[in-house]
Amino acid sequence: MKKENITYGKVHQVIGPVVDVIFTESSQLPRIYDCLSVKLAGEELFLEAAQLIGDDIVRCIALGPTEGLARNEKVTNYNHPIEVPVGKNVLGRMFNVLGKPIDGKEELPKKPQLPIHRKPPSFDDQSNTLEIFETGIKVIDLLTPYARGGKIGLFGGAGVGKTVLVQELIHNIAKEHSGLSVFAGVGERTREGNDLYYEMIQGGVIDKTALVFGQMNEPPGARMRVALTALTMAEYFRDHDNQDVLLFIDNIFRFTQAGSEVSALLGRMPSAVGYQPTLATEMGQLQERIASTKTGSITSVQAIYVPADDLTDPAPATTFTHLDAKTVLDRNIAALGIFPAINPLESTSRLLDPNIVGINHYKVALGVQNILQRFAELQDIIAILGIDELADEDKIIVERARRIRNFLSQPFFVAEKFSGIAGKYVPLSDTIQSFKEILDGKHDDLPEQAFFFVGTIQEAVEKAKRLKKATVEEK
């Protein structure tokens, strides 16, 4: 950094996370998004320029706590946006919003670094082909396929397997696609981030992952920008290393919430439900950078908190417009012991189209959904009258639906140490063929238990033989 590029100002006023800085000359004023710093309790507090007020004052958002900051403190303007480390060095490491390591390991080299505010790929560079991103997880690949370079919303409460699903996706892209993952913890619990870090070490996927955290105890400035820090790291892998990158954002709602916290202090008039008037713009600036190019892709999985379960709330509603697929984790399915506990009827994807996935995949997926839908409709009758009162045709549907429901379960690699069952990666072609055979009634003679926690249909057949043998031996 050249010395002549640096200019100096003074703290004019402090209102919570918003700091006004005054400069003596207008030529010294920073540009919007420029990075500034001020000494506070022996450490550097970083600020980001957000508004220019009058001829000599710039209003900034603090990226750390402002307690103890006094007027007339000297402020350094670096004349460039926040820059964070990128490249292979960030893998296996954990960072804060400024790209500084928070895992207690050695500092990273100064280069390469990139600014966190960047333009999305141009139309010429973006890939215009819709392509399925194979995850190896049956229920996802069949019923709610993910797009390469797409955006997926992950809806799930506490304890339904959201973290395990995230880890399995990271594992599968690392092992099967030689891909990389970047995890952004936005405004969530510090304990959860800590648990995730150590679980990734145990699962053997940390070396293919970079983690960036701006947790809920941090100021709104950090929570607003941490997703951009993670995205910048992912963009480097996509653009320079031509990699397929998986970007996890947990939780995208906290990104919106942080913007809402500082919006009023920046003097903006609140819009619907008290959100910032720039909500759609801020969301668009983040989401448009998550894209697939001709050489690599960023596929994002975004956990979404829905305030008061109101899907019409402006924050989730603004996010929905950008999503390609919706994966819903259901507590009732988890209660049955079926994992991943994905609701096959509520989860959707715009890729489930015969022109994209092919007519065979589409027909099988539709057949599975129809049977499960009919099974759901028959549940009340079964509960009141019993299964014996159903028509023969409905009895067959119920039996097949139970087999399908069990077969949608799958042993995960990252859960091997808990379940004692070896993890399975199931190619899409095997998934389609397996469910087609169940729909055609080829395996109506197999017990329902044989379909539980297996990979392909061949494994279910083998498991049925083992169950039969065990039953004979018991007798």
From Swiss-Prot:
Keywords: ATP synthesis, ATP-binding, Cell membrane, CF(1), Hydrogen ion transport, Ion transport, Membrane, Nucleotide-binding, Translocase, Transport. One of its GO terms (molecular function) is ATP binding. One of its GO terms (cellular component) is proton-transporting ATP synthase complex. Its main location: membrane. CDD domains: ATP-synt_F1_beta_C (cd18110), ATP-synt_F1_beta_N (cd18115), F1-ATPase_beta_CD (cd01133). It holds the Pfam family ATP-synt_ab_N. Signal peptide: none annotated. It is an enzyme of class 7 (translocase). It is a peripheral membrane protein. It comes from the Bacteria. Its EC number is 7.1.2.2. ATP binds at residues 156-163. It catalyses: ATP + H2O + 4 H(+)(in) = ADP + phosphate + 5 H(+)(out). The keyword Membrane applies. It is found in: Cell membrane. InterPro entries: AAA+_ATPase, ATP-synt_VA_C, ATP_synth_F1_bsu, ATPase_a/bsu_AS, ATPase_alpha/beta_chains, ATPase_F1/V1/A1_a/bsu_N, ATPase_F1/V1/A1_a/bsu_N_sf, ATPase_F1/V1/A1_a/bsu_nucl-bd. HAMAP family: ATP_synth_beta_bact (MF_01347). Produces ATP from ADP in the presence of a proton gradient across the membrane. The catalytic sites are hosted primarily by the beta subunits. F-type ATPases have 2 components, CF(1) - the catalytic core - and CF(0) - the membrane proton channel. CF(1) has five subunits: alpha(3), beta(3), gamma(1), delta(1), epsilon(1). CF(0) has three main subunits: a(1), b(2) and c(9-12). The alpha and beta chains form an alternating ring which encloses part of the gamma chain. CF(1) is attached to CF(0) by a central stalk formed by the gamma and epsilon chains, while a peripheral stalk is formed by the delta and b chains. NCBIfam families: atpD. Belongs to the ATPase alpha/beta chains family. This is ATP synthase subunit beta. It comes from Mycoplasma pneumoniae (strain ATCC 29342 / M129 / Subtype 1).
